Structure formats: structure tokens, C-alpha cells
Amino acid sequence: MLFRSPRVAIADLTRDDLAEAVEDGFRHSVLVCMASSYDAGVFTPMEDYLNRLEHKAFQNRTVALVENASWAPSAIKAMKAHFEKMANITLVDKTVTIKTRLTDAYVKELEELADEIMQKF
């Protein structure tokens, strides 16, 4: 089971309202950003989201990062660059890189990430 907290908000940045996703980011103490690599960076909707968080002075949060790529993963590096500009952001040590598709091994990695995040509570 991947969801281990009763208070979780999930946003699909390609479909959901960006303002609501930003609001949810401020509502919770831990943010998990999951995005695909795109053109040696991060997928455009996530880039827009991170720019908005940066503009709104997002701070004092714990952030975990997950990327998906079929080759040349770059999303985590791009997301880290955004969060490094923000004040008092604690990046979770464990990151997850999913190559191509979700497998049982990646599910195990995501569960380990969830365990690490839950230790913060």
C-alpha cells in the first residue's frame, strides 16, 4: 500500500487546476513531486508548478522526489534545482527513478520512500 497517511492530496498537473495544486502544496508539511523527464529537464506542467511555488515563496517543507524516464533521467535534477532556491526545504535523501514502467521492484522502492517520509511524523 503506497498511501500511509490519512491526509493526502493528489494532483495530476496535466489535468487539475494549478492554483488548487499550489494551495495543496501549502496545506501539507510534506510534498512528493513525481514527474517525467522531458528535454533534459522536467515535464512542462511540473516546471510550471515549481515556478509557481517559487514565486509564492514556498518554504519550511519536506520534499521527496520521484522521476520517470525511458532514458537519460533528468527530472530529479531539475526539480532539485528549483527547491534549492527555496528557503528551509528539506529534501528526503531517498529518491526514486522509474525507468519506463512501474514494476514490483519500483513499488518496493516507493514503499521504502513512503516509510522514510512517515518517519518525519
Sequence positions of predicted segments:
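FMN-binding flavodoxin-like domain, especially the glycine-rich phosphate-binding loop
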Residues: 3-14, 21-121
